[in-house]
């Protein structure tokens, strides 16, 4: 997020001084690290939680269209940076990877069929295929069928325009571009405070080695510290952060690097979450390409840790509690008992039980091929609510001061996939007096800026074709 915002600002105001502070010795070691996330270019091509079923049996596609629109904005920005030489070879961070939805059981097959009918004619979902034929599905992803009962009803959708994104590599590329063009990067720097001083913000930090204190004054501060953004915004004292809390959820995946297994799965395949389970529980079997090497990941399996970062402290959750967010946090917990039950179930699950979840996707999976990895921490947003006292939301939220001089990002998925539209929204919120003069430059970077591609099928086709060509991915 920080690297994206910095890169956009460098295009708009090349004369502005940009400083980046990183708690670890280099960027992208936390949530952006490719093994701390699934690397899905989230565009709702296969993620079934974006297309819920209405009470009348019809399929709601508004959320799917919104997420896809957002990812198209990110694609346009990345394509612009590649075309202008600001990003290197695109295959170093993004690769064409078919996106599939796969379900079993008569009710789920019926749902997926109706979802396909609702999406297939939409301009952002062109090329979506559907099949209930085991041999067709085997051709799409050979690992899904062997060992499966022939009597089991199954269905899948597939679209070639999906992507696998190495957000760690992308973050490093963007940061390198910034430092090559005048930005100053300080690693091993633990920011300890952000305080207002008249019309400036004083950012205080200590070296992780030696604990030497430093400070710098800035006219604008963006807090893109992942799970630690909440605490730093609380320290800033802005009233807009009052009532916000965070609930950390850790994640685990199973991974295999066995080339014989990996070669038989060239897609990201998303299933359907169990009834009553939270969106984060959607199981998926993913092709990952990291540093040019393919692997497979399956998960996520949820866990609990009070840390707000993978390298954080076990005191993080308790340190985030304030008088103004205590009621929202308690209320959100009381109204999300299904999440609590889900987490307890995941914590109690044995290794064999977890592996059985993989075998629902890949019946012939061999435990000898797979090993467990721990993914990043996701701090879900808790916010005050007039009716319920507090609610837990699965998404991201920009929190900014009234005068727009400080802002931060809270939350998790879809996260990095929508970094560009989120940061463009932040610019509109924090720099309302400049946004009009920036529009020509923003439109050069993101041709659809200020419009919706879904309103203009011809323009949508042109934009997606152009970005696919620039990024070397499928249309």
What would you call each of these model-derived segments?
Residues 43-45, 240-267:
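Central beta-strand plus flanking loop segment that forms part of the substrate or channel wall
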Residues 89-102, 139-181, 202, 338-342, ...:
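Helix-loop-beta segment of a Rossmann-like dinucleotide-binding subdomain
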Residues 223-238:
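Flavin (primarily FAD) binding-site architecture
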Residues 39-139, 294-295, 307, 313-316:
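Dinucleotide-binding Rossmann-like beta1-alpha1 core, especially the glycine-rich loop
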